[in-house]
């Protein structure tokens, strides 16, 4: 899934999401049953090098993309979770990240297990793609878990505040959860990214109608 794109893909929208949403490189074929070809992190031990963990995470993410294209959404969700599991613990908390950005020596050598700047960016990009893709998969369910969609989208926005798809889907999730003020906020933020997107415009109109009705009921109750 590209991190910029149309709002198509939310439940009930006029048009479905683009296949393979959330992935950059052409993915390999999905292996049914969750095997994936890459060993689970625990199978090789905690001493695996960051580069190997990142490689495996990217492989699982790519397999998830293929599963999404094949409309195997449950399998895709499993692949994206496996990708995130590979990356778990690689990035330090935000406070420590600033300290880690300083060179470990005058030569700028990295301590064992510490990520390079390029690796850190790669890890964050994979995490963003996986969370966006998980939200896209959940929105294909017959009964959508909008609370979980919201959770994944907010994780993306914490890392990349102007991510269009996460902004739009956050708005959709808040709309269906009945929090129309927050829905309108995120939808308007999405509109600043793509002012002509028809799905964003439609959900803004729906949200404003809900807010208007709520306001009218409050006046009648006074």
UniProtKB/Swiss-Prot annotation:
GO terms for biological process: bone development. It comes from the Eukaryota. The modification Phosphoserine is found at residue 105. Keywords: Phosphoprotein, Repeat, TPR repeat. TPR repeats lie at residues 56-89, 125-160, 161-194. The keyword Lyase does not apply. PROSITE patterns: TPR, TPR_REGION. Residues 1-49, 88-116 are annotated as: Disordered. Coiled coil: none annotated. InterPro entries: FKBP4/5/8-like, TPR-like_helical_dom_sf, TPR_2, TPR_rpt. Belongs to the TTC9 family. This is Tetratricopeptide repeat protein 9A. It comes from Homo sapiens (Human).
């Amino acid at each position: 899934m590209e991190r910029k794109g149309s709002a198509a893909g939310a439940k009930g929208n006029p048009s479905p999401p683009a296949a393979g949403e959330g992935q950059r490189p052409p993915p390999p074929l999905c292996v049914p049953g969750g095997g994936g070809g890459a060993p689970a992190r625990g199978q090789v031990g905690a001493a695996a090098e960051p580069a190997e963990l990142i490689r495996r995470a990217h492989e699982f993410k790519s397999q998830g993309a293929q599963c999404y294209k094949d409309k195997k959404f449950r399998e895709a969700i499993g692949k994206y979770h496996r990708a995130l599991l590979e990356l778990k613990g690689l990035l330090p908390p935000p406070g420590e990240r600033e300290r880690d950005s300083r060179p470990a020596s005058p030569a700028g050598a990295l301590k064992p297990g510490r990520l390079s700047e390029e690796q850190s960016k790669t890890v964050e990009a994979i995490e963003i793609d996986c969370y966006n893709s998980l939200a896209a998969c959940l929105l294909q369910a017959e009964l959508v878990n909008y609370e979980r969609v919201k959770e994944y989208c907010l994780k993306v926005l914490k890392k990349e505040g102007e991510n269009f798809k996460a902004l739009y889907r956050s708005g959709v999730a808040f709309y269906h959860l009945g929090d129309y003020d927050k829905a309108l906020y995120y939808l308007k933020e999405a509109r600043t990214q793509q002012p002509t997107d028809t799905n964003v415009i439609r959900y803004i109109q729906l949200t404003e109608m809900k807010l208007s009705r709520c306001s009218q009921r409050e006046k009648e109750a006074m």
